[in-house]
Amino acid sequence: MEEKIAFKNLHSREYQGHKKKVHSVAWNCTGTKLASGSVDQTARVWHIEPHGHAKDIELKGHTDSVDQLCWDPKHADLIATASGDKTVRLWDARSGKCSQQAELSGENINITYKPDGTHVAVGNRDDELTILDVRKFKPIHRRKFSYEVNEIAWNMTGDMFFLTTGNGTVEVLAYPLLRPVDTLMAHTAGCYCIAIDPTGRYFAVGSADSLVSLWDISEMLCVRTFTKLEWPVRTISFNYTGDYIASASEDLFIDISNVHTGRTVHQIPCRAAMNSVEWNPKYNLLAYAGDDKNKYSADEGVFRIFGFESS
């Protein structure tokens, strides 16, 4: 089967702005802005133009690493950041100003919006989940788990909530009650990351066993696995049509596979372990960031975007 996209003809561009390594990259809902969160305690918002030029604005205020960030799914200029300083902040990407702040109980490492934009879920290093009401920016639900909780996600309709765990399971909870519905024995080692396919048919899970599994959301059954990586899978993302999945780890490449066949269609070479990959919601542009160092062994503070027709 011929692939629809000639990946081999596409190029990556590099964006420099942070003083230390970038932990997280995320696109806004219109695909026009990309945010990057860094160990340098800042986030930056980049206005990416179709030919790849960018203007950026700095979001300053956190006093520890910005570990993950996510955009309001209904508002192209509102972004939430999670930091090791125990706060979660809401920002206006036009002004660069922090509009809301919530002080939570631990070092925050995971954050995700409910698809309707009303709630934000935050996970911390102590395996505690906090749900914030976005309007008041106050916690409406807190739950501590007795096992390691990694990346978290809602399904497209917002009535199911997924937790990836250190036990190799995916816990499926009914939302908003957070009532356990299912435990999926997904992998032989810890599950680190999860992505929901934009068509709503599938979700994918990346694991320490180096595999990515693809699950049918209505049946809760594993459809196939992607086996190209050899190291623990740190980050995964579906493209906007749901036809391709990108996955990355400490392997020195990002794998892009066809979701329907399971076959690799392209590999993007990397110079370091990757922390975050995310496809643009409107175009086949893949942002990625990792532990890149310069020749003096200092963090480069860069991210890249793959998918441009010229370098």
Where do the language-model regions lie?
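A short helix->beta-strand "capping" segment at the edge of beta-propeller domains
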Residues: 2-19
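A short beta-strand motif characteristic of beta-propeller blades
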Residues: 12-14, 55-58, 97-101, 138-143, ...
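WD40/WD-repeat beta-propeller blade N-cap
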Residues: 15-22, 59-66, 102-108, 143-149, ...
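Loop/turn segments within WD40 beta-propeller blades
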Residues: 25-31, 70-76, 112-117, 153-159, ...
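Conserved strand-to-loop turn within each blade of WD40 beta-propeller repeats
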Residues: 37-40, 81-85, 123-126, 164-167, ...
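Blade-level signature of beta-propeller repeat domains, shared across WD40, Kelch, NHL, RCC1
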Residues: 275-311
